[in-house]
Amino acid sequence: MPNNNIRTRFAPSPTGYMHVGNLRTALYTYLMAKHDDGTFILRIEDTDQGRYVEGAVDVIYNTLRETGLLWDEGPDIGGPVGPYVQSERMGMFKQYAEQLVAEGKAYYCFCTEERLEALHAEQRAHGEMTHYDGCCRDLPKEEVEKRLAAGEPYVIRQKIPREGVTGFDDMVYGHIEVNNSEMDDQILIKTDGMPTYNFANVVDDHLMGITHVIRGSEYLSSTPKYNLLYQAFGWNIPNYIHCPPVMKDAQNKLSKRNGDASYQDLVAKGYLTEAILNYICLLGWSPKGEYAEQEIFSLADLVRIWTPDGISKSPAIFDPLKLRAINAEYIRRLSPEEFLAKAEPWIDSAVHTPINKKLLCANLQPRCEVLGEIPEQLDFFDAMPEYDVSLYANKKQKTTPGSAKEALEALLPVLSDEALDFNDRDAVFDACKAKAEELGKKNGWLLYPLGIALSGKQRTPGGGTDLACMMGRETTLERVKAAIEKLNG
C-alpha cells in the first residue's frame, strides 16, 4: 500500500461491550486520520475464539455509527486491502512466519506444555521472571525436518537478538529503548496454526498500509518486539501513539469487569452520544492555543483541531461529575424540538395519561442534566401520591395548611371557568395572578398550594400553573377538590 497519506485502523476484538477506553482509542484513531484527510479503517480481530461474544461485532458497528466514527474501509463495505476480518485472513500468516524461519529470523519450537510448565516453575522458584530458555533455538536443520515429517506438534518463535538494544519512538512517550536480553522469543504461530495477536497485528498493519498505530500504553512493553518483526521483514515501521490508561481512581483502571460503565451503559442511563464522545476525548487529551480553555467540542470541531501532541502521559481519571456537567451543557444547547424528541421516550416510560409534553419539556430542559433522571420527576402524573398536609407550610411563601385551603378554594372558580384555555399557560397564570391581587396576596401564596395539590411534592418540573396546563382542566379540578377535602379532614 502507498504510504503517502495517513492510514489508521481501529481493530477491536468482538468480546462484548464497547468500554470507554476502547471508544477513546476509536475516536483518536478516527481523528488522527480525518484531521489530515486520511483513511480510517475498521478491522475486526476475532482470532481469539475463546473470548468471542455473539453479537459483539454488531455492537462495534452500531457504536461507531451512533458516534459518527464512520470508516472508509471495513468488513461491510470492503476496500483495496481486505478482507477486514482477521479470521478470514488466516491463510497468509503462516507463510510469513515460514519466511522468517527460512531467513534464520524465527525457528520451530517443539517444547511441550509440560516442559514449559516445569521450566517456568523452576524459574519462579529461583525468583526469576518466566521466559523461554531457547531450547529449540539452534536445533540442527536435519533434526527439525525429521521432527516436522514425523508430525510432531510445534510453534514458530521469533529469534530475538541476544545482544544490543531495540529502540522506538512514540509520539507521546518519546524515545524508549529495551535491552534485547530482556525480551523473550515470542511465539508467532501457535500449535493450532493460528497466529498470535502480536504477529497478526504486524502483518495486517503492514499489508493494510497503516501509517499510525494508536493504542493503550499497556502495549509499550510489546512494541520493541513489533519493531524487531518489522525490521526482520524489512518493512516500514509505523508511527506509534500510545495513550495513557483511563482510570476509575488513582489505583484502579476503568473496567467493565468491575462494573464500570460502557458506552452502551451510559446511553442507557440517558447521556447524549455527543456529550459522551466530547468527554471521552478530554480523557487524556487537552486542546492547545486558542482552544485551551474550551471544553465543548463537536466531532467536526475535533476533526479540525485534534492533534496527538495534546495527549498526556499521565493516566486519565474518569470523572462522572464532569461527564454530567458536559451532558447538561449539551442538553441546554438542544432546540426545544430536539429536546422533546430525545426526552419523549423517557416521558412515555413514566407517564401514561395525556399531558402537554411540549410545556413539560420547556420546564424540564433548563433543569435536566441526564435524560434517565426524567421519569423519577414525573411519578405524580399518573396517580396522586400520598402526602402529608404539612407540605403546605412554607415560610418563604407565607403559607400554612389553613391558608392553603383558603387559596385552593379561591382558585377553584378561576380554574373552573370554561373560558380559560389550559393550552395557554400565560392566560392561566394571569388569571391566577389576578385572583391573588384581588385577595391582596402575593402570587406564591396562591400558586405554591396549587403545586402541592397537583403533585404532592415540593419539587416539580414547573410551578402550579405549569402543572395545571400540563395536566389539563379535568385532572386539575379533580386534584384541587381532593386537596380541599384532605385539608378539611
Predicted regions and their residues:
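Small-residue-rich helix-loop
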Residues: P336-L439
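Structural motif
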Residues: M18-V20, L266-E274, K313-D319, H352-L360, ...
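N-terminal Rossmann-like or analogous alpha/beta NTP/dinucleotide-binding catalytic cores
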Residues: P2-A125, S222-W235, A275
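Glycine-rich phosphate/pyrophosphate-binding loops
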Residues: K34-D46, F199-H212, F233-M247, P461-D466, ...
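Residue-level signal for inorganic ion chemistry
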Residues: T29, I60, L100, G104, ...
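Charged substrate- and nucleic-acid-binding regions of tRNA-handling and nucleotidyl-transfer enzymes
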Residues: D426-N488
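Active-site cores that bind ATP or allylic diphosphates and position pyrophosphate for catalysis
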Residues: A102, Y107-H242, K248-L254, S262
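Conserved phosphate-binding loops in nucleotide/dinucleotide-binding enzymes
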Residues: P83-S87, F110, I189-K190, M208-Y219, ...
